[in-house]
Amino acid sequence: MQLLRSLLKQISYESVRGDDDRKITDICCHSEKVKEGSLFVCINGYRNNGHEYVPQAVEHGAAVLVVDDRYVIESRSGPVILTEHMKVNVYELIRDRNICVVTVRDTRKALSALSAAFFDHPAERMKMIGITGTNGKTTTAFLTAGILQEAGYRVGMIGTIESYDGRRRETVKNTTPESCEIHRLLSRMVENECDCCVMEVSSQGIALQRTADIFFDIGVFLNIESDHIGKGEHATFSEYLYCKSRLMRQCGIGIVNQDDPNVDKILAGHTCEVENFSIRHPSDVMAEDEWYEMGSGSLQSHFTVKKEWQREEVVMQLPGQFNIYNALAAISVAGHFKVDREQIKAALAKQVVPGRCQNMSAGAGYVFLIDYAHNEMSLRNLLETLRKFEPARLIVIFGCGGNRSVLRRYQMGETAGRLADFTIITSDNPRWEDPGRIMNQIEDGLRGTVRAGVKPSYIKIADRRAAVEYAVSMAEKRDIIVLAGKGHESYQEIKGIRYPLDDRKIVQEALDGGVREYHC
């Protein structure tokens, strides 16, 4: 528990109405998580306004409400919290419920500062590693954690696939959770004696101030591509780039991909010590002599790491140059933990990342991969990489998420038409959009390759399970099939409901023989 009066010293506020001499039992920003004595912070989300949930928070036992002062209006009966659908009298909350109401200019900023203070600033009590980039955050986080664990460090993780507090693994809704959840997790890591935390830091997480009160000992920049632009994400690429660059002003050591064309913009105004990694340019850590090997149902990447005067041969089960970049970032981080070269090589050789180039096809004679590639850059990198293994045919199955960038659909369709031998267009997470419309927009991209002299070969199968079964039914020796877009996800989101659907499960069932006969 923390005393409210002490917590309020951590923020700038406009007013405090009610008794601030009270103990707080918890802090949260979702009304369903409120319990007796909680401090509830009202934040605005993409779809919901947290101020609308004040009545629910009060019913669940909230002791303190932190609200945006724009929603507090003076009336004849006193100040009221007013939204389009809700009106609550502040004095009645104080009189009838003994609730304290705090008004601030920015509730997200307040949530971050209050959360850090409530959990006693756990980020200051272990090494913090933050990883950002359009693609590769999850793989780099797993590679980094794997290397550090191989060296005997106790490592916590926060990222797209899961959080790990040193003892328990949990799935998370967002790549970078809300700040109250981040600091709760960090606090558990400290309790479980973690030496460090590896965290994926999304641009949205930075923009929404979820990491505002964390100073990272090491910040890693992987890459940036024109993605995540649109309603509910970033308004422009410049805004997206700026959000990514903020990590370099929030860390002690910045490790950057020297080959990314926007690296100088990422470093603009940086306050950190800078190190770099590269395949194409002289850098602190480099990779060269890369080559790829396809066995019976397996793919391997081989390369040489060059660091100062040292050279080491490395083998990974993760295919492709983009994964070599991810490995270089992880190796660069490991250098600050004095990890032995053999430990680095051993960790990289065995690391598997759920839903990231995950090979499902041992012994099948062909390779069936599941990958999270869900934008043009990641799909292009993936398909170009798989081409280097010289498969008999390269078959790709993918869709695009609804309520996300529309341009992404054409771009991914064009990329698939240009790089794959056969494409199966299917449904991803349509969310609130018509899946058929999304598939048609992907098809437009495939057809667009005709202008470049390519005649794309493809089929549309809306049912994702049926699309996988169709791919397995047509698979031949030395084919590579890749199911892209959802990776580790265990659901399909349709009109606000998440239905159970796990690519790994449906692929395994298809490979085990549950394939229907198709006539197309």
What role is predicted for each listed range?
Residues 103, 108-258, 262-273, 328, ...:
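Phosphate-binding loop of NTP-binding sites
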Residues 1-111, 291, 297, 315, ...:
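N-terminal leader/targeting and accessory segments in enzymes
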Residues 72-74, 162-165, 205-207, 261-265, ...:
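Short, active-site-adjacent cap segments at secondary-structure transitions
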Residues 71, 203, 226, 260, ...:
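Short, glycine/acidic-enriched loop or turn micro-motifs at the edges of active sites
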Residues 67-70, 201, 223, 258, ...:
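Short secondary-structure boundary segments
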Residues 1-15, 33-39, 49-52, 62, ...:
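ATP-dependent carboxylate-amine ligase
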